Amino acid sequence: MPTGLQPAMLKTTGTRLAAAGAYDLVLQDYVRKNAAILDSTVFRGTLYELTVMRELHARLGVSRLRQRGAAYDGGIDITGKWDLADVPGVAPDPHEAAIPRSVRCGASRLKPLRRKILDGTARPLDVLVQCKALTTARVGGRLFRELFGAFGAFGARSKVHRNNTVLMLSSPNLLTRNGIAVMNQLELPIIYLRIGLPRIAADGSLRDGYLEHYYENAYAAALLDGCRVQRLIGLHALPL
């Protein structure tokens, strides 16, 4: 982990992009068309995935989102592109000083994304998302090991892909200390998103289901250092 970067659970309070309204319409349409199966596991899982897509777009600016949702999805529920160079207020100032050309994280050395942006060599990050609509259990290390395996099955374990891909795990619950430890042991950029379960009100409208906390593992923190993601979504550090 770069000097001065300390892992912290972050609470989000930032603004939402206007285009989130389009996803709200998709969610409402999905609920309306599936009113007969509101209690089914499949319905709730799909509803949560759609909710996560909305938050990815509205809060983080992830685009080209695609719900895989097949029986053979390889453990990846959503894919997308994250062009941080194109998000207002995120890309570094061209005159910003002390942007290293490489940093060490564990046994690996990588080029920070902000350096690539300044060099003109950055391309949108590939985003691979796994959704876990858990209702009770906190998120432990096992799920991150499974995510690591899903990344390998997706055919992206080479160094080139690793440094241009961000893995995200989304769940309504908090991380355990074991979950945090395992996350930081894995030399892959991993972000944990705590996104609440959407709630269907008596009138059929949707409530809740918002991005509440955001956590980068050590590798992701090194890759994204200085990209001002915290500024984008309005983050406040919470003790782990």
Swiss-Prot record:
Key words, A-Z: Mitochondrion
Annotated Gene Ontology cellular component terms: mitochondrion
Pfam entry (one): RRG7
InterPro entries, per database record: RRG7 (IPR018828)
Chief location bin: mitochondrion
Subcellular compartments: Mitochondrion
Family according to the record: Belongs to the RRG7 family.
Protein name per Swiss-Prot or TrEMBL: Required for respiratory growth protein 7, mitochondrial
Native source organism of the sequence: Eremothecium gossypii (strain ATCC 10895 / CBS 109.51 / FGSC 9923 / NRRL Y-1056)
